[in-house]
Amino acid sequence: IAAGGYTTTAVDNVETWNGSSWTEVSDINTAKYNSGASGGSPSSIIFGGLIQPGTVKSETESWDGTSWTEVADLSSGRWGPGKSSYGTSASALCSGGNTGSEAVTSTEEWTAPAVFNQIQEGQLYFNSNAFKETIQDVSGAAWASITASNTPRFGLGGAGTQTEALIFSGAGGSPTANRPQTEHWNGSSWTELNDLNL
């Protein structure tokens, strides 16, 4: 799934890939680019990003395979956080990024309960075929601040899960420069590993 982007302005387009072609599906609620994302089709989240140069967003949107819903925001707006699939739409990490004025080291952990859009509840009535369908709201999705990474940066790469991940490269500092650092997340802390050759 690909969501958002930039042409001459931020766009809200969303497309899914079926192995041979792209298909346009429901748009995200806020047009933005340089966002973080986790998960895939049919269940994803997109978080942070820019709506125009200098305007940073903190919103998180959740994809259920049909539509996007705004859910819990990041603690602060940022663009260019680690963008790789750090998990699913139910568990993810947001590492680093740029607040619009500086690169940051903050890391936030996303957790969401299992959500059931429709719970089918059958009830037996004498001499009846009645069926009741119930919609249930399951709250509790949230971002929580956890141990910050060691190097402030944005536009970084990443891979892994909530309990085992790598972040690498990116840019940061003043003046902005390439960052060669690679860091490992073990579920509770970040450790710097060998630097990339830039």
Give the residues covered by each predicted segment.
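Polar, enzyme-active/binding microenvironments
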Residues: I1-L198
